[in-house]
């Protein structure tokens, strides 16, 4: 059965001739020797898929009586440590941790919440919900409810429940009807009917939404993004704009997130690690192409000029090549 976490446009593929016990032994030596052999760790963990890494971790535990992630945490440091631990974490657990981190402490990282909830499929969201509850004994929905409010909260909860239609079939009649509802809910009236925007944008499939946005332009002579910007505000506006951009082109949306994470003073490693790891087996090749289109330079060169050391080497291996 194909994994819901693997697509056709990733940079990391199954390693041919994979032998988890050989890899586990090599990692044991790399960690247990005098000083850590980072080179071996990087080459094994970036050249295996997540499913293969989890098998290595299982062998490692049988061999050493310790969890691989715990030994990596104890032996490595900084952003390099976070990245390596992410590589040996199951995808749903990784996303659950990222969501927890974005809602922890003072203030909520709305951008991270929006990014994860808009780019994951319904099936993925359901798995993330289970992983979240297993790890924190609280439902993801309850956490979102206590950290957010208003229309933003309402929309996030629908996305967190994994209720978006996933079918690839489109219905032209429904697209026209939805486009008219959106027009009546915003441009055509005084004040805005936020629920209409939430229900359509959070529940319809991406192919269906693309058709709806075309119909919307025919009716209103405006692009849906411009209407959202004119009618809505705050995090709710940001969320709906993210949904529109993901429905149109998810890799382009994520490329823009990477561009912002790498641009200017300082690097947003939280975002950089998350996108590089979570999309490495799904669509990172497409994200790379969109990044170049957006910025005029390659993602590889941006990582190279913005990071250093083992952290840089690992990210470049995940990136998988220069464009």
Curated annotation (Swiss-Prot):
Encoding gene per record: ANXA3
Cellular component terms (Gene Ontology): cytoplasm; nucleus; plasma membrane; vesicle membrane
Free-text comment on this protein's domains from its UniProt entry: A pair of annexin repeats may form one binding site for calcium and phospholipid.
Top-level lineage group: Eukaryota
Record-listed N-acetylalanine modification sites: 2
General function of this protein: Inhibitor of phospholipase A2, also possesses anti-coagulant properties. Also cleaves the cyclic bond of inositol 1,2-cyclic phosphate to form inositol 1-phosphate.
Annotated keywords: Acetylation, Annexin, Calcium, Calcium/phospholipid-binding, Phospholipase A2 inhibitor, Phosphoprotein, Repeat
PTM-bearing positions, type N6-acetyllysine: 177
Phosphothreonine PTM sites in chain numbering: 267
Pfam family, one: Annexin
Record family assignment: Belongs to the annexin family.
InterPro entries assigned: Annexin, Annexin_repeat, Annexin_repeat_CS, Annexin_sf, ANX3
Organism: Bos taurus (Bovine)
Alphabetized GO MF terms: calcium ion binding; calcium-dependent phospholipid binding; phosphatidylserine binding; phospholipase A2 inhibitor activity
Protein's UniProt name: Annexin A3
Annexin repeat residue numbers: 18-89, 90-161, 173-245, 249-320
């Amino acid at each position: 059965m194909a994994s819901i976490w693997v697509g056709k446009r990733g940079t990391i593929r199954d390693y041919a001739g994979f032998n988890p016990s050989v890899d586990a032994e090599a990692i044991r030596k790399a960690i247990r020797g005098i000083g850590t052999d980072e080179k071996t760790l990087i080459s094994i963990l970036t050249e295996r898929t997540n499913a293969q890494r989890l098998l290595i971790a299982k062998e490692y535990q049988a061999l050493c009586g310790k969890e691989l992630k715990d030994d990596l945490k104890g032996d490595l440091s900084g952003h390099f440590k976070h990245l390596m631990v992410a590589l040996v974490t199951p995808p749903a657990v990784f996303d659950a941790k990222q969501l927890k981190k974005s809602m922890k402490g003072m203030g909520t990282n709305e951008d991270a919440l929006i990014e994860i909830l808009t780019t994951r499929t319904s099936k993925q969201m359901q798995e993330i919900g289970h992983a979240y509850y297993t790890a924190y004994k609280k439902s993801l929905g309850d956490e979102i409810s206590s950290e957010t409010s208003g229309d933003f909260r309402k929309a996030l909860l629908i996305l967190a429940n994994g209720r978006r239609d996933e079918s690839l079939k489109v219905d032209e009649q429904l697209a026209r009807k939805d486009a008219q509802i959106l027009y009546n809910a915003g441009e055509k009236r005084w004040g805005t009917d936020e629920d209409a925007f939430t229900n359509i944008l959070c529940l319809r499939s991406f192919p269906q939404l693309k058709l709806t946005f075309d119909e919307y332009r025919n009716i209103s002579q405006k692009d849906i993004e411009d209407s959202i910007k004119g009618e809505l505000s705050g995090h709710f506006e940001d969320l709906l704009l993210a949904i529109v951009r993901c429905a149109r082109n998810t890799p382009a949306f994520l490329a823009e997130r990477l561009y912002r994470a790498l641009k200017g003073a300082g690097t947003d490693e939280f975002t950089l690690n998350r996108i590089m790891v979570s999309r490495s087996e799904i669509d990172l090749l497409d994200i790379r192409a969109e990044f170049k289109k957006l910025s005029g330079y390659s993602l590889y060169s941006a990582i190279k000029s913005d990071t250093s050391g083992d952290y840089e080497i690992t990210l470049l291996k995940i990136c998988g090549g220069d464009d």
